[in-house]
Amino acid sequence: GTWKGEQGGAILSHSIHIHDLISMIFGPVSNVFAKLTTRVNNIEVEDCAALSIEMGNGALVTSSITLGAAEDVSRLKICFNNLTVESGGSPDKPYNPAEDEWKFLAREPITQNQVDEVLSSVELTKSWYAGMFDEIGKKLDGFNSDEVTLLDARESLEFVTAVYNSSRKGKNIYLPIGKDNPLYNSWLPD
């Protein structure tokens, strides 16, 4: 865990895909406030983080990250107006929540039967690289696709930049990140 080697810690390595998933669901990030620290491991980079994120659509997201838990888990809980969605947080699938057990819980006026009916019509898709290559294949064949684009990658890196910048400055950082951001070319500490 060095700045020279990995060039980032838990934000860059362990939680980046969860944050990408949040952006896929809610759209672009508007701003982030981050507290990062190293508390558990003898490394240079962060191993713990607490993030407060506001999405462009107004949704609020909190994210807590630690490399000090007894078990490696990725757990998501997403609360909509009439639906709560929870991943199982299985230690058997810490880096693949898509293949974990999920709960979709209705809240009035939506009924659980309505939710279950919608879920029964959803096709399972592949995850990891198999899923990525399926989406690229769809795009190449002229079909609608959820392939990851260069814009997605840029927005992900801008989010990481905003997180590191926020932690160092102690303030909210708004996205998108431009060339005027002091961390635009490097996240390495001074």
Where do the model's predicted regions map?
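A general structural signal for well-ordered alpha-helical segments in protein cores
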Residues: 18-19, 129-134, 160
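Short arginine-rich
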Residues: 159-169
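A short, glycine/Asx- and small/polar-enriched loop/turn
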Residues: 44-48
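Glycine-rich phosphate/pyrophosphate-binding beta-alpha loops
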Residues: 16, 64-72
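Conserved loop-to-helix N-cap of the C-terminal "lid" that shapes the substrate pocket in Rossmann-like
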Residues: 12-15, 147-153
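C-terminal glycine/acidic-rich active-site capping loop/insertion
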Residues: 77-151, 173, 178-190
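Predominantly a Rossmann-like dinucleotide-binding segment in NAD(P)-dependent oxidoreductases
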Residues: 1-42, 170
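Active-site beta-strand termini and strand-to-loop segments that position acidic
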Residues: 51-58, 78-80
